């Protein structure tokens, strides 16, 4: 069964508010194949700007605060990076 009634309507309405700089860490993690050494993450995605509560930061700078040398899974990577970034709202431009 399909929903033919809402073909032209967007699934989620996007607001017209300020933009958020940087990529979500989940998007960066989805581009990688796990398991990976931290140095490989830096080599492949280190120059990527990610969203943090302190504003946009390069991923390699965030990873300097992560002590894990090897990430077995995507979940482990995201957990450790989020712990290094801190929690809170992400500022908009």
Curated annotation (Swiss-Prot):
Domain of life: Archaea
Listed name of the protein: Protein VNG_0358C
């Amino acid at each position: 069964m399909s929903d033919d009634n809402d073909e032209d309507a967007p699934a989620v309405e996007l607001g017209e508010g300020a933009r958020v700089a940087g990529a979500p860490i989940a998007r960066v993690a989805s581009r990688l194949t796990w398991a990976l050494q931290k140095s490989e993450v830096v080599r492949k995605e280190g120059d990527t700007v990610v969203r943090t509560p302190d504003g946009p930061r390069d991923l390699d700078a965030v990873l300097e605060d992560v002590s894990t040398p090897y990430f077995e899974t995507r979940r482990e990577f995201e957990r450790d990076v989020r712990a290094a970034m801190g929690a809170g709202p992400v500022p908009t431009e």
